Amino acid sequence: MSQIDKLLTRLVRTPAPRDFTWQQLVKVMTHFGYEELEGSGSRKKFVNLRTKHKVLLHKRHPDSTLIGPQIEDIIDALKSQGYIS
């Protein structure tokens, strides 16, 4: 099982992981063709340059782990684009 497969398995498990980091999210999103772009302040967006699909998120600080609603938004976005089922 590849590292991306392991990260995806952790991302979609129930209950949502409490220790999924921003760096792990960047790896997953990059795998699906998304690029991380800076917004104002802690706002970040992932844009798929091929499909122009955007995922808008707030990067928490100083702790960069994702919280439940962020994980749900990411899962919904990836499902809507057909990247995960």
What are these regions (language model features)?
Residues S2-S40, L49-S85:
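Basic nucleic-acid-binding interfaces
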